[in-house]
């Protein structure tokens, strides 16, 4: 037994008051695994009990005080020595003294501000946790408990469609259109692709969802691109005037809301990447940023029904672009 552990010690346990009824959410850990954590939202109260159990009954524990903290923290993996705290709340549970028997302490952090979504990425981690500490002269006794925070949004007032023309002069000219520029995490991307000029032999076409994580500032900026999904649009050569519909369901993919300049430390953005491959394996692509957001748990119609309604509205809203193009000549 080491000198520092000689004498009385204690175990700490943190229990939330609503642990039996509060929902849990899966969240990815640094090693890529998934664990379930208690789920909270911005403004919710965090309350519970701290149980301090003496390891050796009958022996007193000298301490410099008990406290519990609620912390929101950003950790950049390339700068692990520095933790950037954007929320830091402290409650003192006991003054310095001696503890003769195991005790339980109540705590409550009322209407806690939780401005950002929990996130574990390639180069950064944003976490919220409770930390209970028994302060001692030589070595403190600590226990941490992580929670997960989701940020909810309302339906955006402005949500215009995305419409662009891309091509190679005298070789390829296409127009693509997506029904919206902002999607919730269980939404359906509905769109169309029109081939106005095809003079190269296209053999494959797909849409990729790309997640781009940006960390750091100034000269210390790191970018990580991750392909979340690949959606095959066609396999074979298109012809002039052909129109190909797109229906891409987002619910099956692991994504977070778009996160822009979080505490001036990192961003997470999403892009639709339109990719064409010709018979000589040359790749042509065009990226377009989209905004993702998380909606609350409200009653929704089935995703297939949503897709059908969105498709009907989208297809019936305008004359087909190839025809409109010909009419303008």
Swiss-Prot record:
Q: What's the source species for this entry?
A: Danio rerio
Q: Which family does it belong to?
A: Belongs to the VPS26 family.
GO-annotated biological processes: intracellular protein transport; retrograde transport, endosome to Golgi
Instruction: State the superkingdom.
Output: Eukaryota
Q: Which PANTHER family match?
A: VACUOLAR PROTEIN SORTING 26 RELATED (PTHR12233)
Q: How does it sit in the membrane?
A: Peripheral membrane protein
Q: Does the keyword Hydrolase apply?
A: no
- Taking the first listed entry, what is the main subcellular location of this protein, grouped into a coarse class? cytoplasm
Any one cellular component term from GO for this entry? cytosol
- Fetch the InterPro entries from UniProt: Arrestin-like_C, Vps26-related
Protein name stated in the entry: Vacuolar protein sorting-associated protein 26B-like
Keywords in UniProt for this one? Cytoplasm, Membrane, Protein transport, Transport
Its biological purpose is as follows: Probable component of the retromer complex, a complex required to retrieve lysosomal enzyme receptors (IGF2R and M6PR) from endosomes to the trans-Golgi network.
Q: Name one Pfam family in it.
A: Vps26
* Keyword Repeat attributed: no
Location comes to: Cytoplasm; Membrane
